């Protein structure tokens, strides 16, 4: 019921309750809120138990599709297909986004012929085919 309320929202509600009720009426307000939440929870539990007793085994049959839908909510098609096709093994482990396999930088980088620093006043080599 309250799974979408985070700590920030809860803090805002507490601060708003403190300002609205004031420090002298806040304990009575918190007690009333606790009693109300407990009563609503008891009503919901009673309704569920009454429905379960009236429907009998059909109640579990009605809950099964709802539990299946709850499982689909966190469905990831890519992960499901990978698990189905490769029995949980991911064949793409170690493959980069462009499809190449990563290797050590020394193996993938081309080796320049001469990598010495230029002397003062010396011009860098010029390749007419590269421009």
From Swiss-Prot:
UniProt entry tagged with the keyword Transport: yes
Chief location category: membrane
GO molecular function: protein transmembrane transporter activity
A GO cellular-component term linked to this record: TAT protein transport complex
One Pfam family of this chain: TatA_B_E
Annotated segments matching region Disordered: 80-131
GO biological process, one term: protein transport by the Tat complex
Topology versus the membrane: Single-pass membrane protein
Compositional bias segments (type: Low complexity): 102-112
Protein function: Part of the twin-arginine translocation (Tat) system that transports large folded proteins containing a characteristic twin-arginine motif in their signal peptide across membranes. Together with TatC, TatB is part of a receptor directly interacting with Tat signal peptides. TatB may form an oligomeric binding site that transiently accommodates folded Tat precursor proteins before their translocation.
Alphabetized NCBIfam families for the sequence: tatB (TIGR01410)
Assigned protein family: Belongs to the TatB family.
Protein's name according to its UniProt entry: Sec-independent protein translocase protein TatB
């Amino acid at each position: 019921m309250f799974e979408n309320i985070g700590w920030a929202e809860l803090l805002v509600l507490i601060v708003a309750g403190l300002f609205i009720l004031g420090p002298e009426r806040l304990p009575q307000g918190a007690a009333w809120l606790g009693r109300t939440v407990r009563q609503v929870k008891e009503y919901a539990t009673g309704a569920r138990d009454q429905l379960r007793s009236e429907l009998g085994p059909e109640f579990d049959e009605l809950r099964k599709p709802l539990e299946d839908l709850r499982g689909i909510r966190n469905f990831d098609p890519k992960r499901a297909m990978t698990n189905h096709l490769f029995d949980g093994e991911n064949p793409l482990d170690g493959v980069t986004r462009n499809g190449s396999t990563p290797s050590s930088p020394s193996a993938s980088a081309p080796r320049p012929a001469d990598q010495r620093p230029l002397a003062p006043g010396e011009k860098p080599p010029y390749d007419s085919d590269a421009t």
